[in-house]
Amino acid sequence: LLFTPSYQNGVIKELVTEVPRDDFDVEKEGQVEIIGWLYQYYNEEPHDQVVNINGGPVKTDDIPAATQLFTTDWVVRYMVDNSLGKKYLEHYPDSPVKGKLKYLLPGDITPDQSDFDITRIQVMDNAMGSGHILAYAFDVLMTMYEDQGYAKREAANSIIQNNLFGLEIDRRAFQLSYFSLMMKLRRYDRQALNRSVMPNIHVFIAAPAVTEEFLHSLKASSEVIDEIQDIAAHFMDAKTLGSIIELPANYDYAGMRNALEPVATAQKISLFGNQQTAQQLLEIIATAETMTQRYDVVVTNPPYLNKMNSTLKKYVKKHYKDYSADLFSVFIWHNINMTKVNGYAGYMTPFVWMFIKSYEKLRTALLSNVKIDSLIQLEYSAFEEATVPINTFVLKNTKNDETGTYLRLSDFKGGMMIQAEKVQEAIADPGVKYLYRTNQT
């Protein structure tokens, strides 16, 4: 079991007293909400223990407990509606899809006359947790496929196989994401679990030791052998570094797979564990290939962590020096570079990056290279689970001085439900005093 059943304390008590009733309603897509809340409450005690240990660096095994927070539903909808939703409306501005994007903020939509194929729109969450963002993106994509004339069963299978991608360092969270997406698919295709349809999501594993004996078992060129050794070196600390690992753009993934697959599937068992090593390396290659793609939309609630252990701190200082104040700021910059030109990146992060000197280089880089398409500054204590003041925002990977949309909710106390109500009021009446339309300079 994930937890000890108890109605007096622990997970069940939290579910009964803290989770909105609608989140239990399967007809209202409540099953995904419940998976997320279950995992957050399951992690609540270890999270509190980890973040309060003498104020010291967080160990690799404790990073998931220290950094995982379930993203509030309306924030997920805001991020996806204003990134994936907006991407679609750039091609189809008069589509009825617009009316289904409940959290689409008022703002300009730049027409895009280029060819559009819904099966080629790719959405990434590279800190996916229990899959809340990807699950909602699935729903939005379903409305788009239907708008394009697809049958629901065909659309659902295409979404799982072509549109959604995810990365995660914690295996249990990965398993919940996998389950959530497969349940989404099964809703439209009852036979889905009987076929080999699999979501494009991956969990990070540390690279196995690549011995000389193992390398001798491979039938491959010296160039491919070198690449296998190189990718293994990059993933040595994958359980610590996860999605921020920087990889070469020109790996010969097909060549590496061709070298490893015969060993991974060999009938004769190797005394040296070569099959297992090859299988693990194939898993790493699939993860790496996902990491080195660029996406139309990247949306995530990144980890918030400034108490980095020595391995993470050294890597961040080397590869992300200007953004190293906190792990969330590393993700802000990293994810922009994961996004295609004119693509969108959505985030929920602490709002200190907008004000504090240690994030000045991040602010300068963003203002010089991307457009802040929209931003919502939440009331200081609205998101209690994060223990820090939060904002949520969407960046567009383009240099321009077009007008963005900003909501300042700092005057509205009462938690996340009040914040959601104020967002809805601003969407219904863009003339409210806390909505601003301005460029970022």
Regions found by a protein language model. Name each.
Residues 101-122, 267-299, 311-319, 329, ...:
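Flexible, glycine/threonine-enriched loop-and-boundary segments that flank and lead into catalytic domains
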Residues 1-159, 173, 302-306, 331, ...:
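Class I S-adenosyl-L-methionine
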Residues 16-26, 56-74, 118-128, 157-167, ...:
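Glycine- and acidic
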Residues 79, 167-175, 183, 323-377, ...:
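Conserved Class I SAM-dependent methyltransferase catalytic core
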Residues 296, 300-305, 351:
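Amphipathic alpha-helical repeat scaffolds
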